[in-house]
Curated annotation (Swiss-Prot):
Organism: Desulfomicrobium norvegicum (strain DSM 1741 / NCIMB 8310)
Record protein name field: Periplasmic [NiFeSe] hydrogenase small subunit
Gene Ontology molecular functions: 3 iron, 4 sulfur cluster binding; 4 iron, 4 sulfur cluster binding; hydrogenase (acceptor) activity; metal ion binding
Cofactor: [3Fe-4S] cluster; [4Fe-4S] cluster
EC number in record: 1.12.99.6
Primary localization class, coarse: periplasm
Record keywords, A-Z: 3Fe-4S, 4Fe-4S, Iron, Iron-sulfur, Metal-binding, Oxidoreductase, Periplasm
UniProt-annotated binding residues for [4Fe-4S] cluster: C18, C21
Top-level taxon: Bacteria
Assembly description: Heterodimer of a large and a small subunit.
Cell location: Periplasm
UniProt-listed InterPro entries: NiFe_Hase_small_N_sf
Annotated family: Belongs to the [NiFe]/[NiFeSe] hydrogenase small subunit family.
């Protein structure tokens, strides 16, 4: 969980350009 939290910010920065990446990350962090 700790490693994922550290990698999350990097993914978020790269995901700013593509909504799909952000959505995928959200689903990975808190799937509904």
């Amino acid at each position: 969980m700790t490693q994922g939290a550290k990698k999350a910010p990097v993914i978020w920065v790269q995901g700013e350009g593509c909504t799909g990446c952000s959505v995928s990350l959200l689903n990975a962090v808190c799937p509904r």
